[in-house]
């Protein structure tokens, strides 16, 4: 049996409790592919899993965390992939129901593995490609769900997050007006570099300071009612994140709070090859470079990456490039 390095989560724990272990490399099976991990991004859902979700019954402990990766097929099994194919993989139970990307190798279901189009390698570095899968799929899906056009005014709540910066890049390419929020004026310059036309300090209560017809709510239930109060008539609010740390909301009255307004959400659990191709094509066509906050190169640094995510100071995607 071949041994590999991985982070194995056995129960809820602190970031510093995550340690590199040596475990057996997974054995290939029908409809799954063995992938050599080139790199992966760190996601807030992985921090939440480690912090308090690991004890939920749908989590198959012990598990290797990690909901996304970029890698190379080393054993294609009976699938349509070929050895050597460069792929992205994301979601579908990755890092929860089955072992994910915090490892040197991962055995992944064919349905959640997608070829990276050749055009991507002509436009993006490997680090930039690693920053794409989950964050750009989420941002692209959210922008599409909002039916964003160049005539719209988009308010991005939680704009300094990786998804917020990404969404602004995509929205800027579409040509709409972008209003971005941050807890500090120190981040306004960066927000403007990523497409913001106007920046607002957000203390959780914007009190109708600004009205918009489209809102991307990344903070979640903590500010959702306030965001709905900022929507123009027939406006749309898409709830995609829970940066505020609160997952559920009390006091919501749909008749009152959604009067002549619309609320929707985007859930990134159902990627397809078609959408992955669309995302990379959009990036190339509009000369968009992913926003990277920090690059690590060793699994030993996973605790540092989780702490950086918890600090909300990354200001871009936290990624690992292992090879």
Where are the language model's segments positioned?
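C-terminal hydrophobic helical "lid"/dimerization subdomain
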Residues: 2, 272-323
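Glycine-rich beta-strand-centered segment in the early N-terminal region that forms part
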Residues: 24-41, 53-94, 100
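Short, well-ordered loop/turn sites that connect or cap secondary structure elements
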Residues: 80-82, 148, 231
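Short glycine-centered segments of the SAM/dcSAM-binding site in methyltransferase folds
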Residues: 86, 153, 235-236
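NAD(P)H dinucleotide-binding glycine-rich loop of Rossmann-like/cofactor-binding domains
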Residues: 90-158
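Mid-domain Rossmann-like dinucleotide-binding core that forms the NAD(H)/NADP(H) cofactor-binding site
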Residues: 130-204
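A short acidic, Gly/Pro-enriched loop at the edge of an enzyme's catalytic core
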Residues: 207-215
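Glycine-rich phosphate-binding loop and adjacent beta-alpha segment
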Residues: 222-288, 322-323
């Amino acid at each position: 049996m071949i041994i590999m390095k991985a982070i194995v989560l056995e129960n809820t724990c602190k970031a510093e409790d995550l340690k590199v272990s040596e475990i057996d490399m997974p054995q290939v099976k029908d409809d799954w592919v063995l992938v050599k991990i080139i790199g992966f991004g760190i996601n807030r859902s992985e921090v939440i899993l480690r912090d308090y979700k690991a004890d939920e019954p749908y989590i198959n402990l012990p598990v290797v965390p990690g909901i996304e990766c970029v890698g190379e097929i080393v054993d294609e099994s009976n699938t349509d992939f070929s050895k050597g194919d460069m792929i992205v993989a994301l979601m579908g139970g990755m890092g929860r129901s089955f072992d994910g990307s915090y490892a040197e190798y991962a055995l992944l279901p064919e349905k959640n593995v997608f070829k990276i189009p050749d055009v991507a390698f002509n436009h993006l570095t490997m680090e930039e490609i690693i920053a794409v899968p989950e964050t750009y799929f989420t941002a692209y899906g959210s922008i599409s769900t909002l039916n964003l056009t160049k005539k719209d005014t988009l308010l991005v709540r939680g704009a300094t997050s990786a998804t917020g910066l990404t969404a602004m890049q995509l929205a800027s390419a579409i040509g709409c007006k972008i209003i971005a929020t941050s807890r500090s004026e120190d981040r306004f310059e960066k927000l403007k570099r990523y497409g913001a036309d106007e920046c607002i300090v957000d203390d959780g209560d914007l009190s109708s300071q600004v009205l918009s017809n489209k809102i991307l709510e990344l903070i979640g239930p903590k500010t959702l009612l306030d965001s709905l109060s900022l929507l123009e008539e027939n406006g749309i609010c898409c709830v995609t994140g829970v940066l505020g740390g609160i997952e559920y909301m009390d006091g919501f009255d749909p008749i009152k709070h959604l009067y002549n307004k619309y609320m929707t959400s985007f859930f990134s659990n159902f990627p397809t090859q078609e959408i992955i191709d669309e995302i990379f094509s959009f990036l190339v066509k509009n000369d968009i470079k992913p926003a990277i906050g920090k690059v690590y190169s060793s699994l030993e640094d996973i605790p540092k990456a989780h702490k950086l995510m918890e600090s909300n100071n990354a200001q871009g995607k936290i990624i690992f490039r292992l090879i």
